[in-house]
Amino acid sequence: MERQFEIVSAYSPQGDQPVAIEKLVEGINSGKKKQVLLGATGTGKTFTISNVIKEVQKPTLVMAHNKTLAGQLYSELKDFFPNNAVEYFVSYYDYYQPEAYVPQTDTFIEKDAQINDEIDKLRHSATSALFERDDVIIVASVSCIYGLGSPEEYRELVVSLRVGMEKDRNQLLRELVDVQYGRNDIDFKRGTFRVRGDVVEIFPASLDEHCIRIEFFGDEIDRIREVNALTGEVLAEREHVAIFPASHFVTREEKMKVAIENIEKELEERLKELNENGKLLEAQRIEQRTRYDLEMMREMGFCSGIENYSRHLTLRPAGATPYTLLDYFPKDFLIVMDESHVSVPQVRAMYNGDQARKQVLVDHGFRLPSALDNRPLTFDEFEEKTNQVIYVSATPGPYELEQSPEVIEQIIRPTGLLDPPIDIRPIEGQIDDLLGEIQDRIAKNERVLITTLTKKMSEDLTDYLKDVGIKVTYLHSEIKTLERIEIIRDLRLGKFDVLVGINLLREGLDIPEVSLVAILDADKEGFLRSERSLIQTIGRAARNENGRVIMYADRITKSMGIAIEETKRRRSIQEAYNEEHGITPKTIQKGVRDVIRATTAAEEIETYEATPAKKMTKKEREKTIAKMEAEMKEAAKALDFERAAELRDLLLELKAEG
């Protein structure tokens, strides 16, 4: 019997949620490919999307722009759908340094990574769920557009076992080894099996506590049980079990032989090319590395960095689109792009960044040219693989608005909270004025967010506030994701009252205790003060009934004008609704959650060496400036303002020195 999506919640859709749900469902059922949900901060966008999933009954991929946000969405959707398969698929590296080569200093940086076992388990759980049931929601970061093994191969290599089935025990062991399970009778863990006489116990890659016990009677499977791996307690009797491969890059033996032949052919061609061009060191390097990998593949069936040979392993032609998580979904599935104003530019940028790094490795003999095909999807390929998409954002970007001219709005908050009123105050005397406002908020046990334009101003302001006895902390770009979540938690718990930063638009900053957002230098037009970032920043004060925004500015820029008008428009819609329904705004009561254990992001950033401009040639300087300007614009587009500001400062230095 087919399982249905069902929501378990004490709430029913409120405000303009019912209309948004109805329009989105109607659009999906009528075959619309792309829709936009403009949901103001705190209007319950996740609940709306959950109701849409329940109504359309389609497997769904929810894409978030980083691990932290994906973790939050995963927790929320798991609460709404406790009886369905809600899965989590993000990059499984706790720490990741991709392999790279710096020609200027002749430095090769080996790939260095720590794999998070918990996340690896969740990834396997996600892909196996897609082949076993229809009621699947996978919450993924944008890394889901990176190459994965072939879904056909993954499906075909499933070891399917039934009670009463004729099967030789040794044949089962061979099949398990073929799908990357290792025998380990001592340290029994995920991705291994152990043998005791006629009993084979298998620890599936997608589970962390339960294993499968297969009992043989001669050449027949007599019994299948689900067992607690630690205590041995029998949890359930099973008639059938499917053991999915322990790796997503799994290949049949006959395919592996063909792949090895093709890799050898490519190696010969590459060696000929390098030797003809007098690149003897590069030729020696690529031959040594590739021959070692081939030996490992012949003996073990895999090697370190096997994903770099994925084109050969899946027998695809050069330049062919790689397989990704999207290929594991059935044809008729739904994609929800959360915070689309950030995730769409991110998907666009991933291919170019990946190719630039790999091309250097290929040029200098660290990888074969086919490694360039182990890559994320290009934006056009991503578009081709999507079926129906809902873009969700409080400030949809130009691409989304172009794709779907009709925008479905969700402005009213179920709590009756309004978009905050905005004060504009002169820059002269702003710090003293702000200090008075902070003290008022502290007296009421409320919190304050302050956003500045530069790192120096953030640091100076933090030091000044500390000197006058305010409990304040500064949120800067060097702080890693988990630490960031802890700082936000401490702010909510009252360990400090004020948070200062350049980019207060990142995940997890919807804090009900915040009643004041102060925007310094609001009239300095630029990526830090664009209409979209101002609207997002204003939304940070919309979770408290006393929420207010102060913009310190000597004039009203075009971006400020648009942001202020849009906030007023939303506020008047909300006030009219509250009046009509007799609702009094009430601050959200939200428990302070502990840090999610599966969200440690590896933030990968290109660093620029501080080579004095005078030592660079004119051409080198121009090239560096162009590269930094392009990255600065990309960072600004993705609302990563600390990175953009850092690059802006470096650019100014470089131009001044030149």
From Swiss-Prot:
UniProt-listed Gene3D superfamilies: 6.10.140.240, P-loop containing nucleotide triphosphate hydrolases, UVR domain
Residue stretches making up the Helicase C-terminal domain: 430-596
Positions of short motif Beta-hairpin: 92-115
Chief subcellular location: cytoplasm
A biological process from GO: SOS response
Binding residues annotated for ATP, in chain numbering: 39-46
Cross-referenced InterPro entries: Helicase/UvrB_N (IPR006935), Helicase_ATP-bd (IPR014001), Helicase_C-like (IPR001650), P-loop_NTPase (IPR027417), UVR_dom (IPR001943), UVR_dom_sf (IPR036876), UvrB (IPR004807), UvrB_inter (IPR041471)
Annotated localization: Cytoplasm
Record's GO cellular component terms: cytoplasm; excinuclease repair complex
CDD domains: DEXHc_UvrB, SF2_C_UvrB
Keyword ATP-binding annotated: yes
Molecular-function GO terms, alphabetical: ATP binding; ATP hydrolysis activity; DNA binding; excinuclease ABC activity
Start and end residues of each UVR domain: 622-657
Keywords, ordered alphabetically: ATP-binding, Cytoplasm, DNA damage, DNA excision, DNA repair, Excision nuclease, Nucleotide-binding, SOS response
Domain Helicase ATP-binding intervals: 26-413
Family as reported in the entry's similarity comment: Belongs to the UvrB family.
Record text on subunit structure and interactions: Forms a heterotetramer with UvrA during the search for lesions. Interacts with UvrC in an incision complex.
Function noted in UniProt: The UvrABC repair system catalyzes the recognition and processing of DNA lesions. A damage recognition complex composed of 2 UvrA and 2 UvrB subunits scans DNA for abnormalities. Upon binding of the UvrA(2)B(2) complex to a putative damaged site, the DNA wraps around one UvrB monomer. DNA wrap is dependent on ATP binding by UvrB and probably causes local melting of the DNA helix, facilitating insertion of UvrB beta-hairpin between the DNA strands. Then UvrB probes one DNA strand for the presence of a lesion.
Domain remark from Swiss-Prot or TrEMBL: The beta-hairpin motif is involved in DNA binding.
Name listed for the protein in its UniProt record: UvrABC system protein B
Organism (species): Bacillus cereus (strain ATCC 14579 / DSM 31 / CCUG 7414 / JCM 2152 / NBRC 15305 / NCIMB 9373 / NCTC 2599 / NRRL B-3711)
